[in-house]
Amino acid sequence: RHGLPPEIHRANTASLPALLLETVAAVKAKNFETIAVVCRTEDEAAEVRSILDITDADSSAFHNGVMVLPVMLTKGLEFDCVILWKPDESRYGNNPREAKLLYVAITRALHELHLMLDADPSSLLL
């Protein structure tokens, strides 16, 4: 991957949505063509769409340059920037299946990778 090292953004649970909005705005200001917020599940993707005020649940469409989708739908895709939502131990545990999903998520980024956390990161990232 070309670009900057991964950036870790930490906040408490109540502040994380605002931090996500700030991060998305900062990334959009860099004029990347493709930005993805990658979540562990479809339910989390729906939560993030709500935070970003994306009302259309069609995860295959870009909305204001940002796509929100669960990790299972990212395989084979690439994005200029990936924002990984809550890659903590409860979502990506230390087992082969979770390791593969996390690997897929973090390797979708061509130029920038941002990790949004309200807990300690998955041990797979350490």
Region roles according to the model:
Residues A14-P17, A25-H114, A119, S123-L126:
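Core RecA-like ATPase module of SF1/SF2 helicases and allied nucleic-acid translocases
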